[in-house]
Every structure is written in structure tokens, then in C-alpha cells.
A protein has these predicted regions:
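Active-site-adjacent structural elements in enzyme catalytic cores
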Residues: 1-134
């Protein structure tokens, strides 16, 4: 499946299923279009680097659907949680010490001990993140 589709509920559900099956999906955020995959699928994450021609030492941004999900990925102190709850969803990106040690996340984070996390404001992006569960 390829092409440009309206960001309606049916197509967002289809895109979420593509992500769950290891495929890449382009999606809108409030600032740019992103190329997304599951942070738990190393092959899909490697596909993002390949598709973008991105060097492996340049970490990707992980997107979440809710501010309270931040603590699941990063060692977020009270200041970070306060800022996340105040400004997310929106164009604020955190770089924090990471918590999860799965191999795919090693790729996402370019081997660093930090993770870059954002909660986009765009409704289609949020719904895609929620439905894909990643």
C-alpha cells in the first residue's frame, strides 16, 4: 500500500496496522511530516534510517500520545513532567535519560543513553500513535 491518503479514521486505522506489521508510515505533525515505525521493531527502525539516508549516529524522535507516557520511556523528574503536562501536546521535545533497554530503542537512540521524546498536537498524529500502540 502506498500513496497519499486523507487522515480520516479509516486511513489512520490502516496506517496503524501497517506500523504494527513492521511497515513505515509518513504522518503529519504540527511542524513537519514524520516517518514513523514501531520503536520496538528494529528492522522497521533501521528502515527509517535507510529511507531518510540518516546517519546511524543521529537519533530519531520518539512520539507518544499522552504526557503521562513520558515516564515509561525516560527518567523524567518532576520538572520534566510538569513541563510535559503544561505544554503537551505541542511542539516541545525532551532529551532525557532513557529507561527502556530494548534493541530497537538502541537504534532509535543511536546507542545513546538518552531518548528524544515528543507528544505532537496534530490530531491525526495523536490518533495514529494511539491506534498503533507504539
Amino acid at each position: 500500500m502506498g500513496g497519499i491518503f486523507e487522515a480520516d479514521a479509516d486511513n489512520i486505522s490502516k496506517a496503524a496496522e501497517l506500523i504494527k506489521s513492521g511497515k513505515l508510515v509518513a504522518f503529519p505533525t504540527e511542524t513537519v511530516y514524520g516517518l514513523g515505525a514501531s520503536v520496538y521493531d528494529a528492522k522497521a527502525v533501521a528502515g527509517i534510517f535507510a529511507a531518510k539516508g540518516r546517519p546511524a549516529f543521529n537519533p530519531l524522535i520518539s512520539h507518544i500520545a499522552e504526557p503521562d507516557e513520558l515516564a515509561g520511556y525516560a527518567a523524567a523528574d518532576e520538572r520534566a513532567l510538569f513541563l510535559a503536562r503544561k505544554f503537551w501536546p505541542g511542539p516541545l521535545t525532551f532529551v532525557l535519560p532513557r529507561k527502556d533497554e530494548n534493541p530497537a530503542l538502541d537504534l532509535v537512540c543511536a546507542g545513546l543513553k538518552t531518548i528524544t521524546v515528543r507528544c505532537p498536537r496534530h490530531p491525526a498524529a495523536l490518533e495514529l500513535i494511539r491506534k498503533s500502540g507504539v
